[in-house]
Amino acid sequence: VRAAALAKLGAAGAKVLYDVGAGTGSVSVELSLMAGQADVYAIECEEKAVELIGKNRERFGCGNLHVVFGKAPQALDSLPAPDAVFIGGTKGNLPEILSILFEKNPSVRIVVTAILLETALQACESLEAFTSKPAEIMQLQVSRSKKAGKGHMLCANNPIFLISAGGCADE
């Protein structure tokens, strides 16, 4: 899922990247390692998660990764305009977050992950309110094998939606 999200983000050549709702920072770290000289901002409002992002930044030597403790959209106010943004969590503030992002950069590339149909629909509608191109929705379904008697069966995990729009990432 992370690899697909990062591919949709199309962050090559970006100078400023955000990971909103960064959690423990797995996407932030990967963006940092991929981005070279770009500045990556991991925005997270849970204190324990912020501590883990800091530890992961040190562990993987991500000097270009900046940890921002705060809740979006307020935590975005003082940050430089982003070229691309991954949104993994919004605490219900997705329209407000998108408004700030497109205000900072009208051509920003955004990828949102969602597990709820309602969140996917909200992301699609909100993104399309700010862009001239339709948003793209991709559903990813992962199944893992499990031993079942003499054979194996596949057990499905819940689907995840990737909603992307804006910018000029390869389609």
Spans of model-derived segments:
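S-adenosyl-L-methionine
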Residues: 43-82
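Conserved S-adenosyl-L-methionine
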Residues: 33-40, 104-106
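C-terminal substrate-binding/active-site "lid" region of AdoMet-derived donor-dependent transferases
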Residues: 98-156
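Conserved alpha-helix/loop element of class I SAM-dependent methyltransferases that forms part
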Residues: 1-13
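Short beta->alpha hinge that forms the Motif I/post-I loop of the SAM-binding pocket
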Residues: 44-49, 89-90, 115
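Core SAM-dependent methyltransferase catalytic element
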Residues: 150-171
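Conserved class I S-adenosyl-L-methionine
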Residues: 14-23
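Conserved SAM-binding loop of SAM-dependent methyltransferases across substrates and taxa
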Residues: 24-36
